Structures are given as C-alpha cells and as structure tokens.
Amino acid sequence: MNPIAFNLGPLSIYWYSILIALAFGIGIILASYHAEQRGVNLDKFTNLVLLVIPAAIIGARLYYVIFNWGYYSANPLEIPAVWHGGLAVHGGILGGFLAGFWYIRRHKDLKLWMLADIIAPSLILGQAIGRWGNFFNQEAHGGPVSKEFISKFPDFIQKGMYIDGLYYHPTFLYESLWNLLVFFVLLYILKRKSLPNGIVTMTYLILYSVGRFFIESLRTDSLMFGPFRMAQVVSIAAIIFASAFIYFKLKKSKSIEK
C-alpha cells in the first residue's frame, strides 16, 4: 500500500491529506446549505468555519502528540507532519468547539447549539471519509485476523490490511460505516425543527461514542491513560454528559409547552 497519491516535483501528496481535505470540503458545503436553510448569516458562518477548521486540526494534532510525547519529544520535527497520520478525533472536537464558542460569544446574533446542530452531520460525514486516510497509511487497524475472516471483505481491503505477513481487523472501515449510519440518523433528526437546539449535537456525541467505544477495543494503537484506552474513557464521559443534556433539555421544553 503506497500512502503517496502523487508527487509534485519534490513534494509528495499523501492520500491521507487528500481525504482530510475532501472531508472538510464536503462538510463545509453541506453545513453551509443547512445554515442557509435556517437563515444563518452566511458571511458570519463562513468566518466561523474558517476559524473552527484550523483549530480542530491543531487540537487533533496536539491531543495525539501529548499522548505520544515519548516519541515526539525525541522527534520534534515530526510534530507538524500531519500527513503521516496522527489526528485524534476527540482533540479535534475539543479544539473546534472552543474556537467556535469563542467566536459565537462575540456575535450575539449567533446561537451556539443551533450552529452545533448544523455542523454535527457534516462532522460525522467528514469523519467517515477521513477514516479512509487511515487505510492508505495502514494505521488505526485492529489486531491480527485469519485469512478466512478477512476473505469476507473486498480484495482491496484484504490487500491493504495485509501488513508484514499478517492480516488485520479493518477497524477504520467499521468506524467509517458506523459514522455513515450516524450521519443519516442526524440528518433525520435535523429535519425535525420542533426539537430544541442541541439535540442533534448530543445525539452525535452519544452515537459516535457508542461506536467508538466498541471499535476502540479492537485497535492496537490506542492512546493510553495509564491502563485505560483514552478514547473509551472520553466516550463514556461523552455519553453520560450528552444523555443528561438531552434529558434536561427535553424536560425543560415540555414544561414550557405546558
């Protein structure tokens, strides 16, 4: 598996970079469409997106570097080399949210949770696309599997998951397909405009976290916090927080209707 798509002179263009760019591009188009449908000022929304994207990339990279500090402290020139892989989704969510929160606080006509709901389907779709970058880098896979097991997948998956004489769980594919399913669920909920703001976002957190928790248990490259897989710890916390948010938000909405 060659992670390089093509070369421009001395510059190598990686499939990982192409797929991340594609994920952001499609996500921006979709989110802008939903923003326009809901009467959001597109100039302000565009400015928000242009702030959130680099913040998300920086957050995703910093999160990954921090939990792999032993390697990066010895190889500091590798820290900005995101094209080699190493973007942590949870760090990206945190970085993007903090940047968006900062921007929205300075524009009182923008509503945080309404905008988060608009962005959530685009985010999970982008994650579904971006996971294929892991495939080309032959990373974020699970443990070894038998030839019989991997033969159930298409030939190109089998070839991509054949690494150093062994076949591996294509966990990138599991997560990509799960994220795609979550995307359609979020689109359905987003169309129900009677729901309070924030419900789509919290549904995203719950569904993504459920899938990530189970898929993470198969991976061999998990970021660790002591004996715990960090992604699973964050997933549990996200599920608890989002479930409580939805419960109290819907309860408040019903009391207002009465």
Question: What spans do the regions from the language model cover?
Answer:
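A feature for loop-to-transmembrane-helix boundaries and adjacent hydrophobic helices
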Residues: 1-258
